[in-house]
Regions:
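Structural core segment of the AMP-binding/adenylate-forming
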Residues: 60-61, 88-162
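Gly/Ser/Thr-rich phosphate-binding loop
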Residues: 250, 275-280, 289-358, 371, ...
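Conserved beta-loop-beta connector loops within the AMP-binding
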Residues: 365, 369-391
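Conserved AMP-binding/adenylation subdomain of ANL enzymes
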Residues: 205-229, 237-276, 291
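Conserved AMP-binding A3 loop
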Residues: 43-45, 182-209
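Conserved pre-ATP/AMP-binding loop-to-beta segment of ANL
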Residues: 30, 142, 155-156, 165-186, ...
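Conserved structural elements of the adenylate-forming
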Residues: 48-53, 164-167, 197-222, 226, ...
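Conserved AMP-binding/adenylate-forming core of the ANL superfamily
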Residues: 10, 32-76, 80-84, 101-106, ...
């Protein structure tokens, strides 16, 4: 609390930093659970200890404020730990896309220039094939699920759980400048090589607040609260999993992370943990609804945000028929996790099925704290943008 002391007659200049999201999680919901597949269960308090240990371990490896730490992993509690530990140290977390080709992945690693690279063992061979892209990487830390030392591929490798075990849990996170970079993402599906986009602490906190307002301020069936059980199906390397892991921590939702998955294993997690909130691409929702094992599952308590591509009216109708409360959101790498959202708020859920799907499949309205305009070919934002084509 010493960093909150201030002179009489002055106000505390509250920094919008990820540390403040983290402290809310541990202060209000210390006993809430975070579940990783069938392998690990942590309370928020225990996860906080692991976050402290990760920061201490990275510091011991030489990571300082201003450095970059990269991560290549499936959705996991370890990814979540890096979301907090790395930026709270004053470093930048580069979330790297393992679905890219060798040349593109190598470009992102080379461009990010991480001092330490955290890599799931499934992707270690892929990463090593990027060759010179690793020239500036001082430490390659292997993430693995198995704790059997006999299965380790090399005695000289550094392992994630080992460095956490050796690190103290009393690492102290100081208040830092809210305008320093906290995260580095890379575009996918664009022309040429992936482009890097960085976000500051302030921007990420504001995005989290925008999500909170979008999913908590309206009379809607798409609300996100501490009663929810959240499992993201979008990859965490993409816009921090659309920002929802941060929001889940702030509202105190139970969190479930799938690791490497197929549709059958996802359905098992949905069933066993009674998932009530998720975010996914349209293809994932389609695969879930079409899988034979989903026919016997009750989705009536499930809320799903579909993003990454436009949801079709057919898919939206199929989700509604199964009892899923579905919404769609749009974003872009440069604009953060949420630009607009379309869900059945207010009295919109009382219309016909066709009207409902039409609303869900629309571009929606700009999220709180977001401004949207239509720019013409000269790059000028048009005042009559409601009827003017552009981008």
């Amino acid at each position: 609390m010493n960093d909150m002391l201030y002179a009489t007659g002055t106000s505390y200049e509250y920094p919008l930093i990820i540390k403040k999201l983290f402290s809310s999680m541990t202060r209000y919901f210390p006993s809430q659970k975070i579940i990783y597949r069938d392998r690990a269960v942590f309370t928020y308090s225990e996860l906080a200890q692991r976050v402290n240990r990760l920061a201490g371990a990275l510091s011991a490896l030489g990571v300082q404020s201003g450095d970059v730490v990269g991560i290549i992993d499936y959705n996991s509690h370890r990814f979540l730990e890096s979301f907090f530990a790395v930026p709270m140290m004053g470093a930048t977390l580069a979330t790297l896309n393992w679905r890219l080709g060798i040349d593109e992945l190598g470009h992102t690693i080379s461009h990010a220039s991480p001092r330490v690279l955290l890599v799931n063992e499934d992707f270690s061979g892929l990463v090593r094939r990027t060759g010179n892209a690793l020239d500036k990487v001082e430490h390659l830390v292997i993430i693995r699920d198995s704790d059997d030392p006999a299965e380790r591929p090399g005695a000289d490798a550094i392992y994630y759980e080992d460095i956490l075990d050796m690190a103290p849990q009393d690492y102290t996170f100081a208040d830092i400048d809210e305008n320093i970079p906290a995260a580095l993402y890379y575009t996918a599906g664009t022309t040429g090589l992936p482009k890097g986009v960085s976000f500051t602490h302030r921007q990420i906190v504001l995005q989290t607040l925008s999500l909170a307002l979008s999913l908590g301020s309206y009379s809607s069936k798409i609300r996100f609260t501490s009663k929810d059980v959240f499992m993201p199906l979008v990859p965490m390397w993409n816009e921090h999993g659309w920002g929802l892991p941060f929001l889940a921590a702030v509202v105190g939702a139970r969190q479930v992370y799938s690791g490497k998955y197929d549709t059958e294993s996802l359905l098992d997690l949905f069933s066993r943990h009674k998932i009530t909130f998720s975010v996914c691409y349209p293809t994932a929702l389609h695969l879930i609804l079409e899988h034979p094992l989903s026919k016997d599952l009750d989705f009536s308590s499930c809320k799903v945000i579909v993003t990454g591509a436009r949801i079709t009216e057919k898919l939206a109708a199929a989700a509604l028929e199964r009892g899923i409360n579905v919404a769609s959101s749009f974003c872009m790498a440069e604009g953060g996790a949420l630009v607009s959202m379309s869900h059945l708020k207010g009295g919109l859920d009382r219309g016909t099925a066709k009207k409902k799907t039409g609303i869900i499949c629309s571009a929606g309205l700009p999220a709180p704290l977001v401004e949207v305009g239509i720019a013409d070919s000269a790059g000028q934002v048009r005042k009559d943008s409601d009827s003017t084509p552009g981008e």
